[in-house]
């Protein structure tokens, strides 16, 4: 068994994983948007964003319009989640402030280590502090988010 990016040694035929640095969950700053975007795109198996992508004001604006948290291991972004500011019409016609959660991703090297859980907890905590009454989520893997209180609200079949 050879040592690779996830191993630092081979001892008696067993790969040994290196000790991980602590992971910090924090609000994503504008100069960190691109690193966060690359984590999200990687989670979707999409190519990294390009300089041309970030030259478009619409791309930069889309990252500035909401609230974003990222997981950092040292200087490397390893996870991300964000929420757009939104309003939802509820029964009776009232509108309530909503956190429209999106752009969730974790690097493959950091899955199943609590990165998503910590990022979602921070994002939802921040949403409450910002006065959001609801949180909505459109996910490709809806079952993952049940532990945060989300469930399928409807299905469309044709």
Describe each model-derived feature in a short phrase.
Residues 34, 38-42, 117-125, 129, ...:
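A broad, structural surface signal
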Residues 86-88, 109, 142:
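Short coil/turn motifs at secondary-structure junctions
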Residues 129-133, 138-157:
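Conserved active-site alpha-helix within GNAT-family acetyltransferase domains
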Residues 14-85, 91-100:
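Short amphipathic alpha-helix that is part of the acyltransferase structural core
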Residues 103-128, 147:
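Conserved acetyl-CoA-binding loop-helix of GNAT-fold acetyltransferases
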Residues 96-97, 118, 151:
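"Short basic amphipathic alpha-helical interaction patches in structured regions
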Residues 1-10:
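Extreme N-terminal basic, low-complexity initiation segments
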């Amino acid at each position: 068994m050879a040592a690779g990016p996830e191993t630092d040694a081979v001892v008696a035929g067993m790969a040994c994983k290196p000790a991980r640095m602590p992971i910090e969950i924090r609000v994503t700053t504008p100069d960190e948007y691109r690193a966060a975007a690359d984590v999200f795109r990687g989670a979707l198996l999409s190519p990294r964003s390009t300089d041309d992508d970030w030259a478009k004001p619409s791309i930069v604006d889309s990252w500035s319009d909401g609230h974003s948290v990222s997981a950092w291991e040292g200087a490397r972004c390893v996870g991300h989640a964000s929420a757009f500011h939104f309003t939802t019409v509820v029964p009776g016609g009232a509108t309530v402030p909503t956190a429209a959660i999106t752009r969730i991703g974790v690097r493959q090297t950091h899955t199943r280590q609590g990165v998503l859980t910590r990022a979602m907890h921070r994002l939802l905590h921040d949403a409450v502090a910002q006065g959001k009454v609801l949180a909505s989520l459109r996910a490709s893997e809806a079952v993952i988010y049940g532990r945060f209180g989300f469930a399928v609200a409807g299905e469309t079949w044709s």
